[in-house]
């Protein structure tokens, strides 16, 4: 059944473009003939200002669409002279060239000038009922004190700063403080191991690290400072570690360590913002690829901020005075775009959720919605599937009448979870937006909203491209698939302001990863289906990347984490469907002949993955096999391993390139015994 609601954001966009300052006189008229030239582009409607007309305008005339939006939405120090200069063949991406601005001014100062006591942040701390509200004035003062502290300790424009902190006002201030002085932040999820943290610090050549003594999550204490201490032992570029206190517990302070709150208290609550060029780096965020090394994706100033703000406003139908509740961690791109930068640029009240969906019980989300009167709720399908199993009573116990929009992010949402979220959580009245985007895209690219008024929303489908996003489906030979009811590799044919600009220190890797497979197009790595109606449904990853609870992870990373074990000469990791996580990791390992205690090795491998990457990366299942299925050239055929565990070896497809086809029977037999043993112990 389709859910319906007004696509009111589109009308407001048009009115804003035509009348915000009385300066915008550009036309939205679009000819039907030009709008149909781009594959996947929605045909233009006769009505100016309709979703099809705006969508076609953004696709056909990017400068005319984005130029006025950037001019009127953002606060500029110096106007830009060129809206865009992009070439996907070389990975060249530039927006609003010649312009200068400061992101923190756009997120803080402009709102403080108008309404300083408006609530910027509601910190929903780990213990329910202990929320803290921070005004825009308070957040600006905290940001300036932190910015001055960084400068006093030698952090300046262009320096990199690692932030290893859980969701908190001080973490947000740390991000904005970096933006204010022109430093580049790289937030590392505060669940990553010391080794993963060190790898990111070293790749970015960070001068400073900002952290807490400890973190609190789900009633547990997380020893953040200990992890940082271990990490910086191998990080020669780190000159200072700024340590704040989340708990009263004292931690050892070494020669690099600086007590952050004490130092901030000495500083003035005013800091002159650096004027940054539109294409200066704002932040780096590390994400997994199909190879083993995480890549530091670079996002820049103006284009990213504009795109985050516009998608936040239009996809979620954000209106002034709303309380926006995105429960993502700031260590991921969702937290960057829809906890911090998008909402704050729009002057919104944004919720910082420190806890878990089931602490102290399975009603935590909905009790928070009731208490904080949240209007938009944005979370991951993994959490929805988990809470679904606890039943409806935990939801219905609380008043959710404040909710207008529900959002899903991180992975495709299955039909059952979509229906439960819509009917039970949203009482069948809330708009539900299943959003597709990536760390690389900077913001939402495909979602049911914005749309024309009253447009349908279909369960489990991302549906409509955002303005300026022109999806294209490719077949295996690199040909563009036209029309509806087709499936292929999801590409985007045109640049948009929010997309990443490069991989830090390795632009060729950026080009190879995203623009080489289909020259002239951005390749997302995902597959998609386009319906007869022109709607898009994401079908999942097409490369060796798995999505565990909304966290993208390369199988090669897990394999690398296990490769150092002296008893394990070979490993192969694949993803498989999981009821709660969406996907989980399944590892096949080959042991040396003299190993007698398989269980001990398996446990050691799990510990190794948790230590080198994070606990969420640990394979749910590990199967010992005598050998792996390889081609004559030595390549492991992971496709066959996936077939073995998902369909018991049925429909294996072409196996003629296998060096020894009998390996399939061998692994099938081992898997069957493994399953029997698991069934007997459960």
UniProtKB/Swiss-Prot annotation:
It catalyses: acetate + ATP + CoA = acetyl-CoA + AMP + diphosphate; propanoate + ATP + CoA = propanoyl-CoA + AMP + diphosphate. Pfam families: ACAS_N (PF16177), AMP-binding (PF00501), AMP-binding_C (PF13193). Keywords: Acetylation, ATP-binding, Ligase, Lipid metabolism, Mitochondrion, Nucleotide-binding, Transit peptide. Disruption phenotype: No visible phenotype at birth, but exhibit significant growth retardation at the time of weaning. Attain normal size and weight when fed normally. Exhibit hypothermia and hypoglycemia when fed high-fat, low-carbohydrate diet, leading to 50% mortality. Display strongly reduced whole-body acetate oxidation when fasting. Fasting adults exhibit hypothermia, reduced capacity to sustain running and low ATP levels. GO terms for cellular component: mitochondrial matrix; mitochondrion. The keyword Transferase does not apply. Highly expressed in heart, testis, kidney, skeletal muscle, lung and spleen. Detected at low levels in brain. Its EC number is 6.2.1.1, 6.2.1.17. Induction: By fasting. One of its GO terms (molecular function) is acetate-CoA ligase activity. ATP binds at residues 410-412, 434-439, 526, 541, 552. InterPro entries: Ac_CoA_lig (IPR011904), ACAS_N (IPR032387), AMP-bd_C (IPR025110), AMP-bd_C_sf (IPR045851), AMP-binding_CS (IPR020845), AMP-dep_synth/lig_dom (IPR000873), ANL_N_sf (IPR042099). Inhibited by acetylation at Lys-635 and activated by deacetylation mediated by the deacetylase SIRT3. It is found in: Mitochondrion matrix. Reversibly acetylated at Lys-635. The acetyl-CoA synthase activity is inhibited by acetylation and activated by deacetylation mediated by the deacetylase SIRT3. CoA binds at residues 217-220, 334, 549. Belongs to the ATP-dependent AMP-binding enzyme family. Catalyzes the synthesis of acetyl-CoA from short-chain fatty acids. Acetate is the preferred substrate. Can also utilize propionate with a much lower affinity. Provides acetyl-CoA that is utilized mainly for oxidation under ketogenic conditions. Involved in thermogenesis under ketogenic conditions, using acetate as a vital fuel when carbohydrate availability is insufficient. PANTHER family: ACETYL-COENZYME A SYNTHETASE, ACETYL-COENZYME A SYNTHETASE 2-LIKE, MITOCHONDRIAL. This is Acetyl-coenzyme A synthetase 2-like, mitochondrial. It comes from Mus musculus (Mouse). The gene is Acss1.
């Amino acid at each position: 059944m389709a859910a319906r609601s007004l696509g009111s954001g589109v009308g407001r966009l048009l009115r804003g473009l035509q009348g915000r300052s009385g300066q915008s006189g550009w036309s939205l008229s679009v000819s039907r003939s030009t709008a149909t030239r781009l594959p996947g582009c929605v045909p233009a409607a006769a009505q100016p200002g309709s979703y099809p007309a705006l969508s076609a305008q953004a696709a056909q005339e990017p400068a005319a669409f984005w130029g006025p939006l950037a001019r009127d939405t953002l606060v500029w120090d110096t106007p830009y002279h060129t809206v865009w200069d992009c070439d996907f063949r070389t990975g060249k991406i530039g927006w609003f060239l010649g312009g200068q601005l400061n992101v923190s001014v756009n997120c803080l100062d402009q709102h403080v000038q108008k309404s300083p006591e408006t609530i910027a942040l509601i910190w929903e701390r780990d213990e329910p009922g202990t929320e803290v509200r921070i005004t825009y004035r308070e957040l600006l003062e905290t940001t300036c004190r932190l910015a001055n502290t960084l400068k006093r300790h030698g952090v300046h424009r262009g320096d990199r700063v690692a932030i290893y902190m859980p969701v908190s006002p001080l973490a947000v201030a740390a991000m904005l403080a970096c933006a204010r002085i022109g430093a580049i932040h790289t937030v590392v999820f505060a669940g990553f191991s010391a080794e993963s943290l060190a790898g990111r610090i070293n790749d970015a050549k960070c001068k400073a690290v900002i952290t807490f003594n400890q973190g609190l999550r789900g009633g547990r204490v997380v020893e953040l400072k200990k992890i940082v201490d271990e990490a910086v032992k191998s990080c020669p570029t780190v000159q200072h570690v700024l340590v704040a206190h989340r708990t009263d517990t004292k931690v050892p302070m070494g020669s690099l360590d600086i007590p952050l709150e004490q130092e901030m208290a000495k500083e003035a609550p005013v800091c002159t913002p650096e004027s940054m060029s539109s294409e200066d780096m704002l932040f780096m965020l590390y994400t997994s690829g199909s190879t083993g090394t995480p890549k530091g994706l670079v996002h820049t100033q103006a284009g990213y901020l504009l795109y985050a703000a516009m998608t936040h406003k239009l996809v979620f139908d954000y209106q002034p005075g709303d309380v926006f509740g995105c429960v993502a961690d700031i260590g991921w791109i969702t937290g960057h775009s829809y906890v911090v930068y998008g909402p704050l640029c729009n002057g919104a009240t944004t919720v910082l959720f420190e806890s878990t969906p089931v602490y102290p019980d399975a009603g935590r989300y909905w009790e928070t919605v009731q208490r904080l009167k949240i209007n938009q709720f944005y979370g991951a399908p993994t959490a929805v599937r988990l809470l679904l199993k606890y039943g409806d009573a935990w939801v219905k116990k609380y008043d959710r009448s404040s909710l207008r929009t529900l959002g899903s992010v991180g992975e495709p949402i299955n039909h059952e979870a979509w229906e439960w979220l819509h009917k039970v959580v949203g009482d069948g009245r809330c708009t539900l937006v299943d959003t597709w985007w990536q760390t690389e895209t900077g913001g939402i690219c495909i979602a049911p909203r914005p749309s024309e008024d009253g447009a349908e929303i279909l369960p489990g489908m991302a549906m409509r491209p955002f303005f300026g996003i022109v999806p294209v489906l490719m077949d295996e030979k690199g040909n563009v698939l036209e029309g509806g009811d087709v499936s292929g590799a999801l590409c985007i044919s045109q640049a948009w302001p929010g997309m990443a600009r490069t991989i830090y220190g390795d632009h060729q890797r950026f080009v190879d990863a995203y623009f080489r497979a289909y020259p002239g197009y951005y390749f997302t790595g995902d597959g998609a289906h386009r319906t007869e109606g022109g709607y898009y449904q994401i079908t999942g990853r097409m490369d060796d990347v798995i999505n565990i609870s909304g966290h993208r992870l390369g199988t090669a990373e897990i394999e690398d984490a296990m490769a150092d074990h002296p008893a394990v000469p070979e490993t192969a990791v694949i993803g498989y469907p999981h009821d709660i996580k969406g996907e989980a990791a399944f590892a096949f390992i080959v042991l040396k002949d003299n190993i007698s205690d398989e269980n001990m090795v398996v446990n050691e491998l799990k510990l190794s993955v948790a230590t080198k990457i994070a606990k969420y990366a640990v394979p749910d299942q590990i199967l010992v096999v005598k050998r792996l299925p390889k081609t004559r050239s030595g390549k492991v055929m992971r496709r066959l391993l996936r077939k073995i565990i998902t369909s018991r070896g049925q429909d294996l497809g072409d196996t003629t390139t296998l060096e020894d086809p009998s390996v399939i029977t061998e692994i099938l037999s081992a898997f069957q015994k493994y399953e029997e043993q698991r069934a007997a112990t459960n």
